[in-house]
Amino acid sequence: MSSDMEKLIGPRVPADELKAHRARYIIPTLLFVAAAILLIISIQQPWWRLKLNAPQYPAGLFVTAFVNQMTGDVAEIDGLNHYIGMRPLNEAAVFEQSISVFGIIALAALILAAAFVHTKWVTLLVLPALFLPVIFLADLQFWLANFGLNLDPAAPLSSSVDPFIPPVLWVGKIAQFSTVPRLLTGFWLAVTASGLILVGLFFHRRAYKPLVEAQKNP
């Protein structure tokens, strides 16, 4: 192994050390693997749901967000939004949805790769996955704000509704409508994965830092 590669990946664990303290080195690997698996599972799970309460629909209308699509009463909600000048929901986050599946798979691969890196560079590999839940919420809030603040002035009810920002995490109200958001399974799987990554980093540092320091000061 070249010196540059060794600086990046870190020292190998001596066979006698691995035999004596096997759990110390396996725990961070298992935590990283579990985090990667949860992210992969989250792709098929819903991340966020919005209930729209409207006088015309006593039971409410629902739209459910997966990482790569929106399902539910999308057409009905678009029909109501048309009157206040809001764009169709399928125009939101088109780029994000197109890369989401491959992006999450790539994040999971980086987490798995982190199990083979024994230096501080491991943090860079897992950092994107660590902040994925925050990135998801921030992007979702961006699009909600973008749609709510850019209403079509030519819409039938545009004069009766001021631009607004629909909240992503709490109840919102506009005219006679109210929105009730809810975080779902996919999001919580990603949050759990982030927690496993944090714990994995703790055990990773505890396991490999002594080896790195010993390599620097033989």
Q: For the regions a protein language model found, what residue spans apply to each?
A:
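Hydrophobic alpha-helical transmembrane segments
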Residues: 29-38, 95-116, 123-134, 188-195
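Cytosolic juxtamembrane helix at the C-terminal end of the final transmembrane segment
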Residues: 20, 147-154, 193-218
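N-terminal signal-anchor transmembrane alpha helix
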Residues: 22-51
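Cytosolic juxtamembrane amphipathic/interface segments immediately preceding
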Residues: 10-23, 175-176
